[in-house]
Amino acid sequence: HHAYVHGVKKLLLLGSSCIYPRDSPQPMKEEYLLTGPLEPTNEWYAVAKIAGIKMCQAYRRQYGCDFIAAMPTNLYGPNDNFDLQTAHVLAALLRLFHEAREQGTPPTLWGTGAPRREFLHVDDCADACLFLMDRYSDAMIMNVGAGQDIAIAELAALVAEVVGYRGDMQWD
């Protein structure tokens, strides 16, 4: 509301791909928003992001504000979080395989490895945000990503190779 009150000319809300239904087809498309149940483990975070999107759309409709919303895919890059309790998938895999190599024990990976995810470097996300601020003005949310996804099992194999881990991996 304060952006409107203070006459902000353009506002970009960054959301998250968690706004899409848990069982969304891959790759996720903007029109999948609100078409099914959210992932229960981050449902309230997703609801807060969706509320922000809807607020941008409401201010655009009611007051003509140039408020837009972008949904970056899974990001990675400098200053990533490698804490296994809170890290996102790529940083967590890097940490797991590094520790497995150092300790000589196979890592236990979560799930089956079948889900697919898309990844984007933070610098590419920043470039996309600047592009959107300069050239995009629409109520429809805009996904920001590379347009290519990878199975978690494939990603795990790539990370193991990069880290130099040559042992087995276990899926729970």
Features from the language model and the residues they span:
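Amphipathic alpha-helical dimer-interface segment in Rossmann-like NAD(P)H-dependent oxidoreductases
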Residues: 1-8, 94
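Hydrophobic pocket-lining residues that define ligand/cofactor binding sites across diverse proteins
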Residues: 3, 60, 97, 132-133
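Catalytic helix-loop patch of NAD(P)-dependent Rossmann-fold dehydrogenases
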Residues: 5, 9-10, 18-69, 74-76, ...
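Hydrophobic/aromatic residues located in beta-strands of well-ordered beta-sheets
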Residues: 10-11, 67, 107, 169
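Rossmann-fold scaffold of SDR-type NAD(P)-dependent oxidoreductases
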Residues: 13-14, 143
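Glycine-rich "substrate-gating" loop/helix at the edge of Rossmann-like oxidoreductase active sites
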Residues: 42-45, 73-88, 111-123, 146-148
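Conserved active-site helix of classical SDR/Rossmann-fold NAD(P)-dependent CH-OH oxidoreductases
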Residues: 50-57, 61, 90-95, 126-127, ...
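C-terminal substrate-binding subdomain of Rossmann-fold SDR/epimerase-dehydratase oxidoreductases
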Residues: 93, 99-172
